[in-house]
Swiss-Prot record:
<dbReference type="GO" id="GO:0004298">
    <property type="term" value="F:threonine-type endopeptidase activity"/>
</dbReference>
<dbReference type="InterPro" id="IPR029055">
    <property type="entry name" value="Ntn_hydrolases_N"/>
</dbReference>
<dbReference type="Pfam" id="PF00227">
    <property type="entry name" value="Proteasome"/>
</dbReference>
<dbReference type="InterPro" id="IPR022281">
    <property type="entry name" value="ATP-dep_Prtase_HsIV_su"/>
</dbReference>
<protein>
    <recommendedName>
        <fullName>ATP-dependent protease subunit HslV</fullName>
        <ecNumber>3.4.25.2</ecNumber>
    </recommendedName>
</protein>
<keyword id="KW-0479">Metal-binding</keyword>
<dbReference type="GO" id="GO:0046872">
    <property type="term" value="F:metal ion binding"/>
</dbReference>
<dbReference type="GO" id="GO:0005839">
    <property type="term" value="C:proteasome core complex"/>
</dbReference>
<dbReference type="GO" id="GO:0009376">
    <property type="term" value="C:HslUV protease complex"/>
</dbReference>
<feature type="binding site">
    <location>
        <position position="166"/>
    </location>
    <ligand>
        <name>Na(+)</name>
    </ligand>
</feature>
<keyword id="KW-0021">Allosteric enzyme</keyword>
<feature type="binding site">
    <location>
        <position position="163"/>
    </location>
    <ligand>
        <name>Na(+)</name>
    </ligand>
</feature>
<dbReference type="InterPro" id="IPR023333">
    <property type="entry name" value="Proteasome_suB-type"/>
</dbReference>
<keyword id="KW-0888">Threonine protease</keyword>
<comment type="subunit">
    <text>A double ring-shaped homohexamer of HslV is capped on each side by a ring-shaped HslU homohexamer. The assembly of the HslU/HslV complex is dependent on binding of ATP.</text>
</comment>
<feature type="active site">
    <location>
        <position position="8"/>
    </location>
</feature>
<comment type="similarity">
    <text>Belongs to the peptidase T1B family. HslV subfamily.</text>
</comment>
Amino acid sequence: MSNVFHATTIVCVRRGDKVAIAGDGQVTLGHTVMKSNARKVRRLGRDGQVLAGFAGAAADAFTLFELFEAKLEKHGQLSRAAVELAKDWRTERRLGKLEALLVVADKETSLVISGTGDVIEPEDGIVAIGSGGSYALSAARALMAHTALDARTIATEAIGIAGNICIYTNRNVVVDEL
C-alpha cells in the first residue's frame, strides 16, 4: 500500500456580497478510504471573519493553519498575512517541505497560498484546489455563468460534482460562508 495521502477537494466561490468555501470529507491512504467526514474548512481570526480550507498532507495543513492564523493575528489583514506567510514559506527550510495548499477568504478577497510560497488571487472569484480541484472549478464556473444560484449552493454543488468524478473526493460536504 502506498503511504501517500490523497485528502481533498476545496472550492471557494464569491458571488455578490457573499463568499463560500466548501470541502469534501474524504481522506484516502493508498487505495483505502481512511475517513469520510474530515473537516477541512474552518474559520480563522479573532471574530471568525476569515474562511480557510486546505488540501494536501493533513499534518502539514494544520501547521499552515496555525502559522497563517498567527500572521493574521499579527497583521490583522488577509492579504498582508498571506504575503507574510508566503515570505516565511520561501525562507524557512521546515516550511519548504510542507505539502499543502491553503485557500483563504474574507469579505473582500480570496487567495490561494501555494506550496511554493506563492499567493494567487483568482480573477473570477472562483478557486479550487486538491485532487478534484479541476472538476470543482469547472463545475463552479459553469454554475456561475448559467444559473442565479448563490455562492454557498454553487460551492456545495461543485464539490458534489467533483465527488462524482474524482475517486479521492466524496459528497460529504462541509461549507461555510461569510
